[in-house]
């Protein structure tokens, strides 16, 4: 083991520049085609060795069995020592300073779990990269991305990752309290049910949320129970309104305005509350705005160094919370 007893790491949240839900597997997991990008909005995670057992602080209200940081420590210790506690297994203390909104669509819990895995690997070692990746995937679909960070084109359930170009220099604003917080599982279920809406209603809603493609649902594949069939989504191509390929092309141009114009997220179809926030942002200087993951947080993309005072004032006056404003220069 390393001689260090404590490590403190940043745990960056993520945004999805494009998010298309492409299907549902027989095991219930949904497949996606998405472009993920880490942000400057981070939790701070400190992991220390000593004592016995595993303790996690800073995640009040989250049960131990649902706490991804706790489960990450358990998974790592079992892989390294064969047991999460007992003789020969060090005690682990995890302290989390939360900044990423809980259930906000920015993978805050996944980011914390990934930070715990990286910290333990730094403190203890002896677990190979492949095993670390397997532990990450066992915790949740976003944890593998949070483990590596950067910018990735992700498919499968999010675990098949291909590096892509990062955003050029930009200013990011993240707005919270943009709707009712619902679990990711609930949002996927609502998107499943979206295919039952008639085409006229769907087209109207797509126009309201500013989708970049025709979002009319397709009845093909819907069973007698009204549930979308396994492996069938959208019009057979797996697309509702989002277009990861278009985003990848836009990123390759390194033109922020074009990138903002290519942003899209299928979950906006079942998150109508995000529309008002998006309009506030784009009406006050943002080149584009989009729902964060499954929501309900929303981000706005601005030119690097842009004056965002008007946008902040408009957002706060409407009763929303500005969670983060930050510049990301070139790497």
Residue ranges of predicted features:
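Short beta-strand segments
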Residues: 10, 95-97, 147, 155, ...
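ATP-binding N-lobe of GHMP and related small-molecule kinases
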Residues: 1-104, 122-126, 130, 167, ...
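Short, well-structured alpha-helical segments that form the helix of a local strand-helix-strand
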Residues: 128-139, 281, 309-312
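Glycine-rich beta-strand-to-loop/alpha-helix junction loops that act as flexible
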Residues: 108-109, 292-296
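Short hydrophobic/aromatic beta-strand micro-patches
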Residues: 299-301
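Conserved, helical-rich catalytic subdomain that frames metal- and/or nucleotide-binding sites
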Residues: 54, 153-288, 303-331
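DPxDG-like acidic metal-binding loop motif
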Residues: 104-134, 145-149
């Amino acid at each position: 083991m390393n001689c260090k007893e404590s490590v403190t790491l940043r745990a960056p949240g993520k945004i999805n520049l494009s998010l298309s839900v492409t299907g549902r597997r027989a095991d219930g997991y949904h497949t996606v085609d998405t472009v993920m990008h880490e942000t400057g909005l981070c939790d701070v995670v400190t992991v220390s060795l000593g004592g016995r057992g595993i303790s996690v602080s800073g995640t009040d209200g989250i049960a131990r069995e649902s706490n991804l940081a706790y489960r990450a420590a358990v998974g790592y210790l079992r892989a390294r020592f064969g047991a999460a506690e007992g003789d020969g297994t060090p005690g682990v203390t995890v302290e989390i300073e939360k900044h990423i909104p809980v259930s906000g669509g920015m993978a805050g819990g996944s980011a914390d779990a990934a930070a715990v895995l990286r910290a333990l690997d730094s403190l203890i070692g002896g677990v190979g990269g492949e095993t670390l990746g397997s532990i990450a995937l066992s915790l949740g679909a976003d944890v593998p991305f949070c483990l590596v960070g950067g910018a990735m084109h992700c498919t499968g359930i999010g675990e098949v990752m291909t590096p892509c170009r990062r955003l050029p220099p930009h200013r990011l604003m993240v707005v919270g309290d943009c709707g009712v917080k619902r679990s990711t599982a609930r949002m996927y279920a609502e998107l499943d049910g979206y295919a039952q809406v008639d085409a006229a209603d769907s087209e109207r809603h797509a126009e309201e949320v500013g989708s970049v493609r025709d979002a009319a649902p397709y009845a093909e594949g819907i069973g007698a129970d009204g549930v979308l069939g396994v492996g069938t989504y959208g019009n057979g191509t797996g697309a509702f309104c989002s277009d990861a390929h278009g985003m990848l092309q836009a990123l390759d141009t390194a033109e922020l305005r074009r990138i903002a114009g290519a942003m899209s997220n299928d979950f906006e179809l079942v998150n109508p509350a995000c529309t008002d926030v998006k309009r506030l942002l784009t009406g006050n200087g943002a080149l584009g705005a989009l729902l964060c993951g499954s929501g309900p947080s929303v981000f706005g993309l601005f030119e690097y160094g842009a004056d965002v005072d008007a946008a902040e004032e408009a957002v706060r006056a409407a009763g929303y919370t500005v969670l983060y404003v930050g510049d990301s220069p070139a790497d």
